[in-house]
Amino acid sequence: MHELSMADAIVRTVIDAAEKNDAVEVLEVTVEIGQLTLLNPEQIEFMLDVLSEGTILEGARFNLEVVPVEIECECGYEGVVEADELDHFAPVIKCPACGGHEFHVRAGRECNVKNIKIEKKD
């Protein structure tokens, strides 16, 4: 279950950023999760809530944005690979235009803290 370790890393990252910016409270956190990470957003959100207890993050709203897989194929196709075309147990993807596997993945592998909204000291 790599969701736990990823949620822990997110919590540590947000706490570190909040402390560096003299926050008294974290109000909202937006996280981007790429489809190819195979992370379950519902599990991540649950673990973020649990790991936030007793910290500056407790009570914060977590917004999880799923980033679709975008490819650039040798055939010239540039765009999104639809989620229903992905096998979530083994993320083998192919170009929807030519069926090929020779492409560059432009998006969908990331897991980033995109935005943190804090309450600062007066």
From Swiss-Prot:
GO BP annotations listed: protein maturation; protein modification process
Matches recorded under Pfam families: HypA
Gene Ontology MF term list: nickel cation binding; zinc ion binding
Keywords: Metal-binding, Nickel, Zinc
Positions bound to Zn(2+): 73, 75, 95, 98
Role played: Involved in the maturation of [NiFe] hydrogenases. Required for nickel insertion into the metal center of the hydrogenase.
PANTHER family assigned to the protein according to its UniProt record, in alphabetical order: HYDROGENASE MATURATION FACTOR HYPA (PTHR34535:SF3)
Protein name: Hydrogenase maturation factor HypA
Species for this entry: Methanothermobacter thermautotrophicus (strain ATCC 29096 / DSM 1053 / JCM 10044 / NBRC 100330 / Delta H)
